[in-house]
């Protein structure tokens, strides 16, 4: 039997995608819409207070295309906190006009196809920064879920640890070419959601998503073993832009 890779696990993660019922939103009076926006921004302010204390993080992006209109990405120490945040959002007036489109539950993950050592990895500052990240404030985001193939001779889980380590090392070298252009956060979701991993890419240049994903398709680990779900691409929505975005 092949050896399972050990993982380092950090904050729990929720990607919450919503579509907006614009027709229903327009039926409110201007005062009602403004009150709903203020209530929502008050909730986001609480999220920001948590982030300022480095006890979690969040990002809000508008989504391009018809899969969704808005994405909330939330990081918290426990899965209960994610549930509480989702419930608090659902209790707002604005949520009456937010239609669930897609969601993804996972946990920030570093796999150790890493070198082993005597030091506790959870005490290494760089490892902690990656397991408990403050989300980048880039202009654009790209999220997609993925699996490793388990078909015929292309069964990732039948490969030896050394084979998997070598394939992932080559894959990582491709990713390093985009250092400074794209920031990647990998979240593990085996047993938590329908795919095995979620990949969230952040960049100030959306074209870099295409370039990175395309180049990685030629890595053997992706060409032979990668299977992908839907891609969601969006633009950052700051608190200052929320009233403009929701103006009708």
Swiss-Prot record:
Catalyzed reaction equations: Fe-coproporphyrin III + 2 H2O2 + 2 H(+) = heme b + 2 CO2 + 4 H2O; Fe-coproporphyrin III + H2O2 + H(+) = harderoheme III + CO2 + 2 H2O; harderoheme III + H2O2 + H(+) = heme b + CO2 + 2 H2O
Domain of life according to the entry: Bacteria
Binding residues for Fe-coproporphyrin III: 130, 144-148, 171, 184, 222
GO molecular function: heme binding; metal ion binding; oxidoreductase activity, acting on the CH-CH group of donors, oxygen as acceptor; peroxidase activity
E.C. numbers: 1.3.98.5
Pfam family, one: Chlor_dismutase
Bilayer-crossing regions: none
Pathway in which this enzyme or protein is active: Porphyrin-containing compound metabolism; protoheme biosynthesis
Active site annotation, chain numbering: 144
InterPro entries recorded: CHDC, ChdC/CLD, Dimeric_a/b-barrel
Cofactor: Fe-coproporphyrin III
Keyword Metal-binding appears in the UniProt entry: yes
Keywords (A to Z) from UniProt: Heme, Heme biosynthesis, Iron, Metal-binding, Oxidoreductase
GO annotation (BP), single: heme B biosynthetic process
Bound cofactor: record note: Fe-coproporphyrin III acts both as a substrate and a redox cofactor.
Purpose: Involved in coproporphyrin-dependent heme b biosynthesis. Catalyzes the decarboxylation of Fe-coproporphyrin III (coproheme) to heme b (protoheme IX), the last step of the pathway. The reaction occurs in a stepwise manner with a three-propionate intermediate.
NCBIfam families: PRK12276.1
PANTHER family: COPROHEME DECARBOXYLASE, HEME-DEPENDENT PEROXIDASE YWFI-RELATED
Family: Belongs to the ChdC family. Type 1 subfamily.
Protein name: Coproheme decarboxylase
Organism encoding this protein: Geobacillus sp. (strain WCH70)
